[in-house]
Design a protein with these regions (language model features):
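Catalytic core of pol beta-like nucleotidyltransferases
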Residues: 1-25, 33-35, 39, 50-102
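Conserved histidines in hydrophobic membrane contexts and catalytic metal-binding motifs
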Residues: 28
Length: 102
């Protein structure tokens, strides 16, 4: 049985967003996957970018805003290579749910 996520966003919309921003893998993690997800919770999103994706800080802000609009709630967008704390990295990678893979 496929687990239903508490987000209303189509696979086509996710794929279009990922192609536009050169995202090779997009995954959810955190409370969105647990029972403590609430109406006021943000959505934690993990992105792995293509090697040729060279985005500025402003691009990341636009990306986060666009993603927040698409999912209908605040998104916290984290880049996989930015996960430097080994304990946090291990936990996120072990519990994430991939929603797009190129």
């Amino acid at each position: 049985m496929t687990e239903k996520l508490p987000l209303e966003i189509s696979n086509d919309v996710i794929e279009s967003f990922c192609r536009k921003w050169k995202i090779e893998e997009l995954a959810l993690f955190g409370s969105v996957l647990r029972r403590d997800f609430r109406l006021d919770s943000d959505v934690d999103v993990l992105a792995t970018f293509a090697a040729d994706a060279k985005w500025s800080v402003f691009d990341h802000a636009r990306m986060r805003e666009e993603l927040s609009t698409l999912i209908g709630r605040e998104a916290d967008l984290i880049e996989t290579k930015g996960l430097r704390n080994p304990f946090r990295r291990r936990e996120i990678l072990a519990t994430r749910k991939v929603i797009y893979a190129a």
